Amino acid sequence: MTAETAFSAAPLPPVEQRIDVLIVGAGPVGLFAAFEAGVLGLSCVLVDVLDRPGGQCTELYPEKPIYDIPALVSCTAQELVDRLLAQCAPFGYPILCGRRAETVETIEGEHGRRFRVTTSVGDVFDCAAVLITAGNGAFAPQRVALPEAAALEGRHLHYAVRDTARFAGKHVVVAGGGDSALDWALALRKTAARVTLVHRREGFRAADASVAGMRAAVAAGEMDFQVGMIGRLDSAPDGTLTGIALRQREGETRLPCDELIALYGLVSEPGPIASWDVEMRAGRIVVETTAYETSRAGVFAAGDIALYPNKQKLILSGFHEVAMALRRAYRYANPDKTLVHTHTSNDTNLQSRLHAAAE
């Protein structure tokens, strides 16, 4: 199973839903948390600011080898994400990407305290607990640092590709030197009138296969590659993008450009989490270590964003943290029930569900 088959890549309209747990962050730790929620019978939704699940593993180093996941001798970061997506898929929990959790409001009702969480696209979740698995915080794209860029953002300047159809028949410039830049340049050459990849140097921080594919496409005349830095964005009187000025060793070169896709990578920022009334230190959330609960009861943190004595920033540590956090969250979601520990090997209902999904 790939990331593309485990969630909807198409933009989804805002939702309003009552659930047991909202998981903020769909990286490896958040994905395993979804599986654990399913094992415990908790309803949940995952939200992530990025346009696909996987967090840093998918966005920053998908080809990086990982050697310290139990029972896996080695796998790439993307392979780990794909396996985790396959593991939690039988429970059918929504993974809502391209939205950021903005506010967490406490609501008191006849059945006790719950939370009302809103997102950047207008989702509203009524939940018993919130589990923050946001890695190093919310990611934001590294923007084009030119004064004329802001007016073009969302119209002709893009930091992600959400709809390839909008580039049909256009002169497209893709700027960047990572996997995303090369992969999208290669993909769009079949749709756009012409694609030019721009990078500040000849070397790339991308998979060898992607680099080889790009160079082969350039050699075949299917796309162009230019070394240089974007120095200016040119617009028509009506505000449409017409071209870019490229600063090169030999001087300035102007490239025709209807749409610019800048894929310079991501920068980490705390985002709205800093205003959620949880104790933070150096950009991380302080938790206790019996259930990885924050200073705000019912709000938990796990993975790289969690801070406690002798904390190790390891994926496997995050797996343990969410397992413990969700068992405490179960109490908030089911105050009148006692969670009875059952080994998954003895849980016939769970086995039936997993086997049915595999068939």
Swiss-Prot record:
Q: Which domain of life is it from?
A: Bacteria
Q: In the Enzyme Commission scheme, what number(s) does this protein have?
A: 1.18.1.2
User: According to its UniProt record, which reaction does this protein catalyse?
Assistant: 2 reduced [2Fe-2S]-[ferredoxin] + NADP(+) + H(+) = 2 oxidized [2Fe-2S]-[ferredoxin] + NADPH
Which residues bind FAD per the record?
48, 56, 61, 101, 139, 304, 345
Q: Where is the composition biased (Polar residues)?
A: 341-352
Instruction: Please give the InterPro entries that the UniProt record associates with this protein.
Output: FAD/NAD-bd_sf, FAD/NAD-binding_dom, Fd--NADP_Rdtase_type_2, Ferredoxin-NADP_redctase_2
Q: Which UniProt keywords apply?
A: FAD, Flavoprotein, NADP, Oxidoreductase
Q: Which GO terms describe its molecular function?
A: ferredoxin-NADP+ reductase activity; flavin adenine dinucleotide binding; NADP binding
* Group of enzyme by EC: oxidoreductase
Region (Disordered) location: 340-359
| Entry cofactors | FAD
Q: How is the cofactor bound?
A: Binds 1 FAD per subunit.
Query: Would you indicate the residue range of the signal peptide?
Result: none
Assembly and interaction partners: Homodimer.
Which family, according to the similarity comment? Belongs to the ferredoxin--NADP reductase type 2 family.
PANTHER family the record matches: THIOREDOXIN REDUCTASE 1-RELATED-RELATED
Write the protein's name.
Answer: Ferredoxin--NADP reductase
Organism listed in the record: Ralstonia nicotianae (strain ATCC BAA-1114 / GMI1000)
